[in-house]
């Protein structure tokens, strides 16, 4: 089992790091009390082999001793990686002033500036215990995400999951689509009696549609559009891209086009899935 512990000063980017870990398949728990680390790992054993937790000033008193104690009690076979995120007092003060959020130690009736300094002193022992220290003072959220991925994966690029989803307009449009293409103007196998009961997954329907010049041109143009803009979408730090293809009933044309696009992009470095909403609904 892999365990990642993320600690750091409030406002330094722990929530960003946790989101990156979640995108990488980690089971993430924010602000977990230290004494619950062992029970959590025991409960997840066999179901989740990658776990990430964040700990901060709110978790425990006497942090250095408590953390050392809990880490010493980790089960055998746990591969531990730890991060500490830090920013300068000036940057943290600016971030809190901009967001108007309450610092965890501000409840102690101290000023924001005093709370930031106090937290830095209290967390200093932990910052010396971790594997990786990241100063986020001059990093934006994308650069911080890249830094975390670089440490864990040895590379900064994240795996973009591309989903090609077929659907029928008469059953409603999907709400989660990033791109949507209408295939209702293309030649329709529905009007061929022998093809009507079949789907875009069946060979006779495939043969019918692959002979249509308009269908091939439409697929090529969608492919060209996506290839042009994919690098820009990846740089936007997204995890999923859903391309919806719709025809009237979601049985023939949209299914065929979604399958063809999935095959063409399967050779790229992305993870590609083809989903067929109406066919799955009938299954």
From Swiss-Prot:
Q: What residues does ATP bind to?
A: 8-15
Keyword annotations for this protein, in alphabetical order, are: ATP-binding, GTP-binding, Nucleotide-binding
Pfam families for this protein: PapZ_C (PF22740), RapZ-like_N (PF03668)
Quote the record's binding site residues for GTP.
Answer: 56-59
Asked if the Swiss-Prot or TrEMBL record annotates the protein with the keyword Magnesium, the reply is: no
Which Cys-Cys disulphide bridges does the record give? Answer: none
InterPro entries the UniProt entry points to: P-loop_NTPase, RapZ-like, RapZ-like_N, RapZ_C
Q: Please name the GO terms that the record assigns under molecular function.
A: ATP binding; GTP binding
Give the family per the record: Belongs to the RapZ-like family.
Extract the NCBIfam families matched here.
PRK05416.1
Tell me, what does this protein do in biology?
A: Displays ATPase and GTPase activities.
| Protein name per Swiss-Prot or TrEMBL | Nucleotide-binding protein Sama_3091
Q: Which organism is it from?
A: Shewanella amazonensis (strain ATCC BAA-1098 / SB2B)
